Amino acid sequence: AXAKIALIGAGMIGGTLAA
């Protein structure tokens, strides 16, 4: 995986937890 995929995945998880 690329770094971009990791960043996007982390962002989605963070957004879900924040919501």
From Swiss-Prot:
Catalytic activity annotation: (S)-malate + NAD(+) = oxaloacetate + NADH + H(+)
Keyword Ion transport: no
Organism superkingdom: Bacteria
This protein's encoding gene: mdh
Binding site for NAD(+): G9, A10, G11, M12, I13, G14
Entry annotated with the keyword NAD: yes
Protein name: Malate dehydrogenase
Protein's job: Catalyzes the reversible oxidation of malate to oxaloacetate.
The enzyme's E.C. designation: 1.1.1.37
Alphabetical keyword list: NAD, Oxidoreductase, Tricarboxylic acid cycle
Alphabetized GO MF terms: L-malate dehydrogenase (NAD+) activity
Similarity section: Belongs to the LDH/MDH superfamily. MDH type 3 family.
GO-annotated biological processes: tricarboxylic acid cycle
